[in-house]
Amino acid sequence: MSTQPDPVYGAGPVADAAAFDAVNRETGKATGLPNPAYTSDRFSVLERDGLLANTWLCIGAAGALTARGQARPVTVLGLPLFMVRDADGINVFHNVCSHRGHQLVNLPCRMRGAIRCPYHSWTYGFDGVLKGTPHIGGPGVHAAAGFDKSLHGLKRIRSERWMDLVFINLSGDAPPVEAFLAPLADRWRPYLSDDDPSRLKLAPDDDNFTLEIEANWKLAVENFCEAYHLPWIHPGLNRYSRLEDHYQIIEPGRFAGQGTRVYDPVYRNGAEFPEFSGWPADRRKVAEYIALFPNVLLGLHVDHFYAVVLVPVSHNRTREEMNIYYLDDAANGDTYRESRRTTREAWRSIFFEDVGVVEGMQRGRQSPAFGGGAFSPVMDPPTHCFHRWVASGMLAARP
């Protein structure tokens, strides 16, 4: 492939195919993604339209929208979207009115009966169909000759659900979500019986949390993939789940992460959570932490499951939304309230410890002295796996 700058991508390291080719070398000889992959607005748009649009991107938890008409806006690298619960499930649309382009949903809300544009009060059903066009034909005239409402509904985005998570495919032509998830489903099949996923329920809002990070979303993925930083960034965790207790997880092109062999839940004054019925007794202390590319961080334990949705707001802003799931009544029952709070605070503490690291890497990417860095051939293969996924996708997206 030519290493000449591509006029569509622009001159400089953002466009240089050689920079991406260098990522695809063997781990000990590879270079990481170039700085503009983290610092450039233009790269973010190209990344969104050429990489993220062609796969399945997670945008949130369906369980957070419990009633018909509940809606929530989501911004993906500047692209305004929203999801809304209808009688048949969750629908996802571009967050823009078909009339004059006003944004429809600004904040999480519960809408009664219809989606209403605040500008001229055009209304849409929760299925996206245009229902009302007040005064379109003049005062008191709500229809216009030649105007076909069926052609002006909201623009729906292809979406699917898995483990309560809502995934979207912006391009509309990605392989089925089942194929996308198959390698992960195969990996976790020994731990989960067929009915275990249906037993999972999202904990109440106050048993979850959100962190606002001033950094590129990819840095949060990279940090999550590896256990290398545990002794220095998570000294409390490292006291019982040491670096040597972890193992690496790598599925090229799909996911990467780490596992531990010493997971030990602490309930303090709370009740013990129910456990997955299919979990092998001899692996009860195993827990796995997997970054499912591109943007969801998963934690599977014998007694709970979590999904951190990384919402890439802009090239240097990421929202980390922690969604914790428990089995059966443990998600909402008063009996387990203290146990849920203990679990939430434990995870919040750990993820908060990572904030400074991720933001520090973002600041460091402003330095011309850094050119992607290096990878430990022993400790960094999961992180390198993610870099290769990004680099390969960006190369494939070049005209």
Question: Where do the language-model regions lie?
Answer:
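C-terminal catalytic domain of Rieske-type non-heme iron oxygenases
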Residues: 2-4, 84, 94-95, 160-161, ...
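Rieske [2Fe-2S] iron-sulfur-binding domain
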Residues: 64-172, 178-186
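Short Pro/Gly-enriched beta-strand edge/turn motifs at strand-loop
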Residues: 53-64, 135-143, 290-294
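N-terminal pre-ligand scaffold of iron-sulfur
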Residues: 2-108, 158-159
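Short beta-strand or tight-loop elements
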Residues: 55, 77-79, 155, 293, ...
